Amino acid sequence: MPQLSPKLTENLALLNEMFGSSADFYSKEVELYHCRGALVLFDGMASLESLWELLLDAVSRRTPALDETPGGSAVFDLLLHHSGLPAESSPVETLDDLTRRLTAGMAVLLLDGCAQGIAFSVQSLKFRSVEEPAGEGNLRGSREGFADLLRVNLSLLRRLIR
């Protein structure tokens, strides 16, 4: 699989081409330390609230070096190695790795000017199995039952396929 591009717009275009029509694909452009970025995740698989808390906590601990960062690679290095982000954050370098982490329920921060992303372990997966509905016995066909909200059903289905 190809490496991530240092251009944020190219990475977002690839992701939108792959997942843009999915109802649960979430992409939000942000600015961190004067650097454009984007948060990408699957709603229902990753906790958006946990992600915002994690990022706000890390960003609120400003150091003088963070105010003078020249670009995405420096912001990446400072966030991943010199901030209060937990150990469950790790670098993402390829498109294959990015899609694997997204479909595993992780959120990824992409930065303009950096050919890597930061994956955050903020999964909020529903842990129930997909099983046959108790009230409907089928002799033929599919025996899976999806009785939750659409985004919960999508996350269960993504986990089942994975």
Model feature map: region roles:
Residues 1-162:
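Membrane-embedded alpha-helical signal segments
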